[in-house]
Every structure is written in C-alpha cells, then in structure tokens.
C-alpha cells in the first residue's frame, strides 16, 4: 500500500473494480485524449504510447489546478488492446464489428496486452510496464452475442468482450484475470511500490 493519495486516470468501471478489490482508496480522472491519433503496429509500443499520453494529459491538468492533494498523489494510467491471431483490436466501432470479434474467439484466443504508467506527481518519478494474458473461448452462441451487444458493455471494451459476462464460454486463462480486465494486479502493485520509495 501507499500513504499517498491515488488517482486512477481512467473512467473504466473494470479498472476501478480491480483497484477496489486490491484494497486501494482512490479518485478517478478521465484523461480525455484522442487515442486514435496515436498509432503503432506493435501492441506493447501502442499501449505504452497511449498510457504515457494519458498520464501527460492528466499531469498537465493537475499541475494547472489548485488541488494541492492531487499534486502529492500517485497516478495510474493504463491502456489495453486485444491481439487476435496477430491483429490488434481496440474497442469495436460498430455492433457488426463486435459480433465478428465475438464469433472469432472460438478459433484463436484473445491476447490482452496492457501497459501501465505510474507517476509520483510530487517527485516526478515515472515507471511503466506491460503485462500479457491470454483468454481461450469455446464457441459463443449467436443468441448470447445478441444479448451482450444489446447490454452494451462490450462496445466499450478492447476486443469487444467482458470476461465477467462470458463465464459460460471461457476456457483456459493464461495470466491474470485483472490483465484481461485492463489493469494487471501484480504489475500495478509493483509500480506503485517503486514510485512510493
């Protein structure tokens, strides 16, 4: 744990839940950057670049604000893509694209690549890392896909799926479920520890 206040630079309900489950008390701030303006063909590089951009956008906002507590905080920003059969997938842009994503996971697993940037705002120390987890699926029924898309959550998730809604269709998981959710538990804890020293 850390004695400093924590800021999660994300509006993701799944990342929030991971931090809550880890026992942290924190506030959230949304970076509001144009992620599509940042491109790279390597998933690790792409997620690191986007995570850094989120952190820089929030750092600028915090430094310009009058909130002294924020200026003494530790900030966590992360980004996730899903790699499917060598192709990077971000959030689906249409329901049809989401449907195609979900139908494809029985043939190749979803590989979550998540980069995390942690900043000690007061000292300026920045650390970062990347974690990978692979989720295998069995065939997802068309009826269930319709239901998922109608609920809407999957439209806001890299790769167009949420493991917590798809337990009946998941097979082997290699790595941490928190990485699939968008915030690797072990990596995040280690990075927070590094900037807290």
Swiss-Prot record:
GO cellular component: cytoplasm
Active site: 79
UniProt keywords, alphabetically: Cytoplasm, Hydrolase, Nucleotide metabolism
Gene3D superfamilies in alphabetical order: 3.90.950.10
Protein's cellular compartments: Cytoplasm
Reaction(s) the record says it catalyses: N(7)-methyl-GTP + H2O = N(7)-methyl-GMP + diphosphate + H(+)
InterPro entries the record matches: ITPase-like_fam (IPR029001), Maf-like (IPR003697)
UniProt-listed Enzyme Commission number(s): 3.6.1.-
Site (Important for substrate specificity): 14, 80, 164
Gene Ontology BP terms: nucleotide metabolic process
Top class in the EC scheme: hydrolase
Pfam families for the chain: Maf (PF02545)
Superkingdom of the source species: Eukaryota
Presence of the UniProt keyword Endoplasmic reticulum in the record: no
GO MF terms, alphabetically ordered: nucleoside triphosphate diphosphatase activity
Similarity field: Belongs to the Maf family. YceF subfamily.
Function: Nucleoside triphosphate pyrophosphatase that hydrolyzes 7-methyl-GTP (m(7)GTP). May have a dual role in cell division arrest and in preventing the incorporation of modified nucleotides into cellular nucleic acids.
Record protein name field: 7-methyl-GTP pyrophosphatase
């Amino acid at each position: 744990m850390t004695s400093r206040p924590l800021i999660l630079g994300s509006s993701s309900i799944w990342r929030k839940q991971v931090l809550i489950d880890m026992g942290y008390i924190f506030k959230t701030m949304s970076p509001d950057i144009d992620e599509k303006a940042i491109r790279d063909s390597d998933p690790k590089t792409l997620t690191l670049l986007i995570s850094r951009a989120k952190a820089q956008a929030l750092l600028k906002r915090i430094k310009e604000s009058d909130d002294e507590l924020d200026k003494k905080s530790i900030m966590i920003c992360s980004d996730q893509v899903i790699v499917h059969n060598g192709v990077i997938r971000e959030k689906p842009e249409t329901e049809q694209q989401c449907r195609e994503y979900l139908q494809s996971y029985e043939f190749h697993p979803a590989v979550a690549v998540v980069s995390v940037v942690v900043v000690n705002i007061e000292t300026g120390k920045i650390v970062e890392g990347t974690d990978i987890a692979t989720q295998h699926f069995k065939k997802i029924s068309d009826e269930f896909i319709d239901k998922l898309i109608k609920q809407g959550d999957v439209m806001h998730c890299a790769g167009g799926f949420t493991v917590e809604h798809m337990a009946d269709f998941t097979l082997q998981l290699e790595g941490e479920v928190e990485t699939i959710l968008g915030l690797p538990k072990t990596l995040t804890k280690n990075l927070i520890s590094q900037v807290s020293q």
